[in-house]
Design a protein with these regions (language model features):
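Charged, low-complexity intrinsically disordered segments
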Residues: 1-169
Length: 169
């Protein structure tokens, strides 16, 4: 499948406009660990605390912006830095598996490189002024490859796909 025939782009460098659905701030329900959130950002921010009551009380029914603000002011679980990437990966996977229209749109990005370009200086999850780890972009590409393999529509040759252990648990 030629990526150019899908999006016409080899790099998607921001999650705005027609690619806003790639953002964690995109409004779509995500159920994670039995709790339904309005968006994947709220689901992610809720994982910063271990108390389910707090997760439900503070993070369900809120916008992504409110969830992010709440996440900045909560007491972080002690293992947060160790688990945050795995939590993000699992939440992003659920976002697309639970929303077939978004799953199709993700697959329609073909083999485009996905970059969480931003101006707010997030150099861990994204890229700002050409610098950053782009963890969200990498996770989205990983999830895209996994779903394409799951659905039998390989974007890369099957032998090039590495097993993603967390997805098979």
């Amino acid at each position: 499948m030629d990526q150019t025939t899908l999006t016409g782009k080899s790099v998607i460098d921001s999650f705005e406009g027609e690619y806003e659905f790639l953002s964690n701030f995109y409004n779509c329900p995500v159920t994670y660990k039995g709790i339904t959130y309005n968006n994947s950002e709220a689901a992610f921010q809720a994982q910063k605390v271990t108390d389910v009551y707090t997760q439900v009380r503070d993070f369900t029914g809120v916008t992504a912006s409110v969830a992010k603000k709440l996440g900045r002011h909560c007491s972080l679980r002690p293992d947060w830095n160790d688990i945050r990437v795995d939590e993000m990966r699992a939440i992003v996977l659920q976002k697309f598996l639970q929303n077939p229209r978004l799953e199709k749109r993700l697959l329609d990005t073909g083999t485009a490189t996905l970059i969480e370009g931003n101006w707010w200086n997030d150099k861990f999850w994204g890229v700002c002024k050409g610098e950053g780890c782009n963890m969200l972009g990498l996770i989205l590409m990983e999830v895209r490859d996994y779903i394409s393999k799951l659905r039998g529509a390989y974007l890369t040759s099957p032998e090039k796909l590495e097993p993603i252990d967390y997805l098979y648990d």
